[in-house]
Amino acid sequence: MRGEASRISDRVSRDELAPKLRSTGKDAWRIGNELFTITNVLDHTVQLERALTDPSRPVDDKIGVLKELIGAQAHPMTLEIMSDLVGRKWSRAAHIANAVEDFGVDAMMYYADAAGVTLRVSVDLQE
Protein backbone atom coordinates (compact mmCIF):
# COMPACT_ATOMS: atom_id res chain seq x y z
CA MET A 1 0.00 0.00 0.00
CA ARG A 2 1.31 3.42 -0.87
CA GLY A 3 1.84 6.15 1.68
CA GLU A 4 -0.09 9.40 1.60
CA ALA A 5 2.66 11.42 -0.10
CA SER A 6 2.96 8.83 -2.87
CA ARG A 7 -0.80 8.64 -3.46
CA ILE A 8 -1.03 12.41 -3.70
CA SER A 9 1.99 12.68 -5.99
CA ASP A 10 0.66 10.00 -8.32
CA ARG A 11 -2.87 11.41 -8.46
CA VAL A 12 -1.89 15.08 -8.90
CA SER A 13 0.68 14.30 -11.58
CA ARG A 14 -1.72 12.11 -13.56
CA ASP A 15 -4.53 14.67 -13.25
CA GLU A 16 -2.29 17.52 -14.41
CA LEU A 17 -0.67 15.69 -17.32
CA ALA A 18 -3.69 13.69 -18.54
CA PRO A 19 -4.80 16.28 -21.12
CA LYS A 20 -1.30 16.46 -22.62
CA LEU A 21 -0.90 12.69 -22.66
CA ARG A 22 -4.33 12.26 -24.24
CA SER A 23 -3.44 14.80 -26.93
CA THR A 24 -0.49 12.69 -28.11
CA GLY A 25 -2.95 10.47 -29.99
CA LYS A 26 -1.35 7.38 -31.47
CA ASP A 27 2.07 8.41 -30.08
CA ALA A 28 0.63 7.29 -26.74
CA TRP A 29 1.54 3.72 -27.78
CA ARG A 30 5.24 4.65 -27.92
CA ILE A 31 5.00 6.64 -24.70
CA GLY A 32 3.28 3.78 -22.88
CA ASN A 33 5.94 1.32 -24.00
CA GLU A 34 8.70 3.69 -22.92
CA LEU A 35 7.06 4.10 -19.53
CA PHE A 36 6.73 0.33 -19.08
CA THR A 37 10.42 -0.04 -19.95
CA ILE A 38 11.31 2.63 -17.39
CA THR A 39 9.12 0.85 -14.82
CA ASN A 40 11.04 -2.36 -15.41
CA VAL A 41 14.39 -0.58 -15.04
CA LEU A 42 13.27 1.11 -11.82
CA ASP A 43 11.94 -2.17 -10.43
CA HIS A 44 15.37 -3.73 -10.96
CA THR A 45 17.59 -0.76 -10.04
CA VAL A 46 17.04 0.37 -6.46
CA GLN A 47 19.89 2.87 -6.72
CA LEU A 48 18.17 4.65 -9.60
CA GLU A 49 14.86 4.75 -7.71
CA ARG A 50 16.64 6.32 -4.78
CA ALA A 51 18.50 8.80 -6.97
CA LEU A 52 15.23 9.94 -8.55
CA THR A 53 13.26 10.21 -5.29
CA ASP A 54 15.86 11.49 -2.81
CA PRO A 55 14.27 14.59 -1.24
CA SER A 56 17.70 16.05 -0.45
CA ARG A 57 18.75 15.97 -4.10
CA PRO A 58 17.83 19.03 -6.20
CA VAL A 59 15.11 18.41 -8.78
CA ASP A 60 17.33 19.81 -11.54
CA ASP A 61 19.92 17.16 -10.69
CA LYS A 62 17.27 14.42 -10.93
CA ILE A 63 16.11 15.76 -14.28
CA GLY A 64 19.74 15.76 -15.41
CA VAL A 65 19.95 12.06 -14.56
CA LEU A 66 16.80 11.44 -16.61
CA LYS A 67 18.08 13.38 -19.59
CA GLU A 68 21.35 11.48 -19.45
CA LEU A 69 19.53 8.13 -19.41
CA ILE A 70 16.56 8.68 -21.73
CA GLY A 71 16.56 12.26 -23.01
CA ALA A 72 17.71 11.84 -26.60
CA GLN A 73 15.78 8.62 -27.22
CA ALA A 74 12.50 9.15 -25.39
CA HIS A 75 9.39 10.87 -26.65
CA PRO A 76 9.25 14.42 -25.21
CA MET A 77 6.05 13.51 -23.33
CA THR A 78 7.83 10.60 -21.64
CA LEU A 79 10.54 12.97 -20.46
CA GLU A 80 7.92 15.49 -19.30
CA ILE A 81 6.09 12.82 -17.28
CA MET A 82 9.30 11.56 -15.71
CA SER A 83 10.50 15.11 -14.95
CA ASP A 84 7.22 15.85 -13.23
CA LEU A 85 7.37 12.65 -11.18
CA VAL A 86 10.93 13.20 -9.95
CA GLY A 87 9.90 16.65 -8.75
CA ARG A 88 7.31 15.19 -6.39
CA LYS A 89 7.51 13.67 -2.92
CA TRP A 90 7.34 9.89 -2.42
CA SER A 91 6.68 7.93 0.76
CA ARG A 92 9.05 5.20 -0.46
CA ALA A 93 11.49 5.18 -3.36
CA ALA A 94 9.77 2.16 -4.93
CA HIS A 95 6.49 4.05 -5.27
CA ILE A 96 7.77 6.09 -8.21
CA ALA A 97 7.87 2.90 -10.30
CA ASN A 98 4.19 2.32 -9.51
CA ALA A 99 3.37 5.84 -10.68
CA VAL A 100 5.35 5.38 -13.90
CA GLU A 101 3.45 2.14 -14.53
CA ASP A 102 0.12 3.92 -13.88
CA PHE A 103 1.07 6.47 -16.54
CA GLY A 104 1.95 3.63 -18.89
CA VAL A 105 -1.51 2.13 -18.47
CA ASP A 106 -3.08 5.56 -19.01
CA ALA A 107 -1.04 6.00 -22.19
CA MET A 108 -2.20 2.66 -23.56
CA MET A 109 -5.83 3.53 -22.88
CA TYR A 110 -5.38 6.91 -24.62
CA TYR A 111 -3.82 5.07 -27.56
CA ALA A 112 -6.77 2.67 -27.68
CA ASP A 113 -9.10 5.65 -27.70
CA ALA A 114 -7.13 7.35 -30.50
CA ALA A 115 -7.12 4.10 -32.50
CA GLY A 116 -10.86 3.62 -31.95
CA VAL A 117 -10.50 0.31 -30.11
CA THR A 118 -11.42 1.34 -26.57
CA LEU A 119 -14.48 -0.91 -26.50
CA ARG A 120 -12.40 -3.90 -27.61
CA VAL A 121 -9.87 -3.23 -24.85
CA SER A 122 -12.68 -3.03 -22.29
CA VAL A 123 -14.10 -6.36 -23.45
CA ASP A 124 -10.65 -7.99 -23.45
CA LEU A 125 -10.02 -6.80 -19.90
CA GLN A 126 -13.31 -8.29 -18.69
CA GLU A 127 -12.52 -11.73 -20.12
Label the predicted regions.
Residues 1-127:
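Elongated, mostly alpha-helical coiled-coil "stalk/stator" tethers of large membrane protein machines
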